[in-house]
Curated annotation (Swiss-Prot):
Lineage per the UniProt record: Eukaryota, Metazoa, Cnidaria, Cubozoa, Chirodropida
Tissue/organ expression: Nematocytes.
Protein's organism: Chironex fleckeri
Disulfide bond positions: none
Similarity-based family: Belongs to the jellyfish toxin family. Type II subfamily.
Record keywords: Cleavage on pair of basic residues, Cytolysis, Disulfide bond, Hemolysis, Membrane, Nematocyst, Secreted, Signal, Target cell membrane, Target membrane, Toxin
Localization, UniProt: Secreted; Nematocyst; Target cell membrane
PTM info: Contains 2 disulfide bonds.
Name of the protein in its database record: Toxin CfTX-B
Length: 461
């Protein structure tokens, strides 16, 4: 095989919900084979209770036990894959096709991350696991796997043009991947006729029209100031990313099929190029999520904080696969000076008068900073001298302070990170009203509908 083609194919990542398995797992390499084997035994036992055909996964896990016992150097890799199987169990146990598809893709993304895609798989057992998981898409119980994803996205929204495209794509997805799976698993050699039939049934442009329509929706919605449209846009981003990866599932299975033949390298290289182009297009479409301009802020107020909803969490795991830089990861636990961009010498402080507590801008250096803490729901709470800040949005919509520990949704703040390094700040109650400092002698902190300009851009120091 041409080294350039081989290199390109090895670089092919498998798909979806890319989760950095290495994050947050200390000392994985120090785990013993007995610990891994005990974990595998527990997983096999739990998989027997799942209402799905997981026999192939169970057999693969048994093979992995033998692997780590014979070759301890594989422990860290096997541990990563085993962890992904364990984290997917809850999704499998629901019996819901949507969750089962998501669980399958979690496992596949772990393999892609750990072994650098299908061409990097160095263990026969892991290759078997890959094949077993992909095979779930083709089984009778999951022939509506794509349909379930689409239906989930359209529970609250109607888009007849897009629905028509999705119906056309869903009719082919499972049949094609089932055919490819069966051919790839054959013990006998694949004939030229079978290869011709398989490749003719899988177009490298599969889903392209549909994805193009969703891209158009996202490009328009990314700058909307309408709350319903902003939320719709975030939901469609999730659908878009799922379907983009489903497309790559098809093409990746075709790559594996071609690899088994040991020929047609140029054809495989063309498929790889198509996947690369698709990934770049997706990257360009969603890049604004992590490089926000003020015009994107209303959409950003539904995406951030990243871990506040299943949709945002799902989108975030996709963004790594499609090469987006991570958004700012400030922990927001501590005391900060919240400085204004328009008046850099001014920052948020608080004044009290006759029992009322109002937040305003101060220019003196020694004023107290704002204590920012993260709530369990991912939103932020701002406190200064024992008073929690909250916002109103009527004609006199200022930032007030309350002694209540829970300021309510008017005081659950969202920090939307801008490409400039500043933040726009809104609330869970009113995502499209942003905190700004008014142009007056007092410089009171108030809320403004949509983009307040530089007076509503804030820096934390």
């Amino acid at each position: 095989m041409d080294p350039r083609i081989s290199s390109r194919l090895r670089a092919l990542a498998l798909l979806v919900f890319v989760i950095s398995i290495t994050d947050g797992i200390p000392n994985r390499a120090k785990r013993s084979s007995s610990e891994i084997n005990a974990e595998i035994d527990g997983l096999i036992q739990q998989l027997t209770t799942v209402d799905a055909d997981t026999k192939g996964i169970q057999e693969t896990l048994t093979e992995l036990k033998t692997t780590v016992s014979a070759n301890p150097s594989r422990i860290s890799q096997v541990s990563a894959v085993v962890k992904s199987v364990g984290s997917s169990l809850a999704k499998f146990k629901t019996g819901d096709p949507y969750n089962i598809v998501s669980g399958c893709l979690d496992i596949l993304s772990s393999i892609a991350t750990t072994y650098n895609g299908p061409y990097g798989v160095g263990l026969g057992a892991v290759a078997s696991l890959l094949s077993s998981v992909i095979g779930l898409f083709a089984q009778d119980g999951f022939k509506n796997s794509l349909k379930s994803i689409v239906d989930e996205a359209f529970k609250r929204y109607r888009d007849e043009e897009l629905q028509g495209q999705l119906k056309g794509a869903s009719r082919t997805f499972n049949d094609v991947i089932g055919t490819l799976k069966n051919l790839t698993d054959k013990d006998t050699a694949v004939t030229d006729l079978e290869f011709s039939l398989a490749t003719s049934s899988v177009s490298v442009s599969q889903f392209s029209n549909m994805l193009g329509i969703i891209e158009s929706r996202i490009n328009t919605g990314s700058t909307t100031t309408d709350l319903a449209e902003a939320k719709r846009t975030v939901d469609f981003i999730f659908l878009y990313l799922e379907l983009a990866v489903m497309r790559e599932t098809l093409l990746t299975q075709l790559i594996l099929f071609t690899k088994k033949l040991g020929k047609f390298e140029n054809y495989a290289n063309g498929i790889s190029a198509s996947i690369d182009a698709n990934k770049q297009a997706v990257h360009d479409t969603i890049l604004f999520l992590h490089q926000m301009e003020p015009k994107n802020a209303v959409c950003g107020a539904y995406y951030y904080p990243v871990h506040h909803s299943d949709v945002s969490e799902g989108i975030f795991t996709f963004t790594r696969y499609f090469g987006l830089p991570d958004p700012p990861r400030n922990t927001f636990q501590g005391v900060y000076r919240v400085e204004n961009r328009y008046w850099p010498a001014w920052h948020i402080c608080k004044e009290s008068y006759m029992g009322n507590h109002m937040f305003r801008g101060c220019s003196y250096i020694k004023s107290a900073g704002v204590h920012i803490s993260a709530l369990d729901n991912g939103y932020l709470k701002l406190n200064l001298k024992g008073k929690n800040m909250y916002i109103t949005k009527h004609a006199q919509g200022w930032a007030w302070g309350t002694a209540d520990n829970d300021p309510g949704e008017q005081g659950y703040f969202i920090f939307v990170p801008l490409k400039s390094g500043y933040y726009m700040i809104s609330t869970k109650k009113w995502p499209n009203y942003f905190v700004y400092m008014e142009s007056s002698a007092s410089g009171y902190i108030r809320s403004w509908h949509n983009n307040p300009g530089l007076q509503g851009h804030w820096k934390l120091t």
